[in-house]
Structures are given as structure tokens and as C-alpha cells.
């Protein structure tokens, strides 16, 4: 138990030192740098050219879906690398756990595929045509 606490203590000390170094560097730079605000410094920079149009561009939602799926599988790899390093010590139960984990993510990928979120060019939905209504009989033709 004492060894576990000392290992967490080491991690905490490294975390604390990292925060102190980052905060110290930030505060030192903030105190030493000159402050000369200028409207040119806040303008949009496009490779040395004057900006044309608005900097706000609408992106298609498909980019978001592809990026989200990429992040999900990237995180999966982050979880599977440590598992792969200790696979021999964990035994077959760990293999089953990893397969279940990967299977759940693959089910999500199949769901996104079947739903059509991975199709880049989607067919445009066709609007069904209304059937022609028969001409109504005039009141003089009714019995």
C-alpha cells in the first residue's frame, strides 16, 4: 500500500511541477513582453494577402461525422496499446474483454454505415407525386 501511495505521489509531483513550469513561463512572458495593441495585429492573415470575404465558412456536417468517427477509433487505439503490452500476463479473459470492446465499436461503425453517415454523396430524396384526383361530378349529374 505504501509503495502505491509513493507511486501516486511521484505522479502528483510531476503533475504539479508541470503546472508550475507552464504557469511560470506564461506569467514571466506576460510580465516581460511589451504591450502595444494595434488593429493590424488583430486582422485576419491569409498568407500575406488581404482577406477576401468573411472568415466564417460553413462546413458540411459530414466533416463533423467523419472527424467524430476518427476520434472514436483513435481513442480505441489509445486503449488497446496498453492492453497489448500486458496481454500475455492477463490471459484469455483480457482477450475476451478487448474483443467485446472492439466489437461494440465495430457495431457503432456498422450502424453509422447502414444509416448512411459514411456515404459522402447521398442520393437526393425524391418527392412522391400525388395521384391525380378523378374529376368530380357536378351537382346536375348526381342522382
Curated annotation (Swiss-Prot):
Catalyzed reactions:
a quinone + NADH + 5 H(+)(in) = a quinol + NAD(+) + 4 H(+)(out)
What InterPro entries does the annotation carry?
NAD(P)H_OxRDtase_bac/plastid (IPR023043), NADH_UbQ/plastoQ_OxRdtase_su3 (IPR000440), NDAH_ubi_oxred_su3_sf (IPR038430)
Record EC number: 7.1.1.-
Superkingdom of the organism of origin: Bacteria
Membrane topology classification: Multi-pass membrane protein
Q: Looking at the keywords, is Cell membrane present?
A: yes
Q: Which GO terms describe its molecular function?
A: NADH dehydrogenase (ubiquinone) activity; NADH:ubiquinone reductase (non-electrogenic) activity; quinone binding
The record's subcellular locations are: Cell inner membrane
GO CC aspect terms? NADH dehydrogenase complex; plasma membrane
List, alphabetically, the PANTHER family matched: NADH-UBIQUINONE OXIDOREDUCTASE CHAIN 3
| Quaternary structure, from the entry | NDH-1 is composed of 14 different subunits. Subunits NuoA, H, J, K, L, M, N constitute the membrane sector of the complex.
Identification of the protein by name: NADH-quinone oxidoreductase subunit A
State the species of origin.
Chlorobium phaeovibrioides (strain DSM 265 / 1930) (Prosthecochloris vibrioformis (strain DSM 265))
Q: What is the lineage of its organism?
A: Bacteria, Pseudomonadati, Chlorobiota, Chlorobiia, Chlorobiales
Q: Which gene encodes it?
A: nuoA
Amino acid at each position: 500500500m505504501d509503495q502505491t501511495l509513493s507511486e501516486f505521489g511521484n505522479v502528483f509531483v510531476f503533475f504539479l511541477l508541470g503546472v508550475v513550469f507552464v504557469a511560470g513561463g506564461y506569467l514571466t512572458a506576460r510580465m516581460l513582453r511589451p504591450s502595444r495593441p494595434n488593429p493590424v495585429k488583430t486582422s485576419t492573415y491569409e498568407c500575406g494577402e488581404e482577406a477576401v470575404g468573411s472568415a466564417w465558412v460553413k462546413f458540411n456536417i459530414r466533416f463533423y461525422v467523419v472527424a467524430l468517427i476518427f476520434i472514436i477509433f483513435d481513442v480505441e487505439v489509445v486503449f488497446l496499446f496498453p492492453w497489448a503490452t500486458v496481454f500475455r500476463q492477463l490471459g484469455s479473459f483480457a482477450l475476451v474483454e478487448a474483443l467485446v470492446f472492439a466489437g461494440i465499436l465495430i457495431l457503432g461503425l456498422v450502424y453509422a454505415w447502414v444509416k448512411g453517415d459514411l456515404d459522402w454523396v447521398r442520393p437526393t430524396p425524391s418527392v412522391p407525386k400525388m395521384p391525380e384526383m378523378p374529376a368530380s361530378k357536378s351537382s346536375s349529374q348526381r342522382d
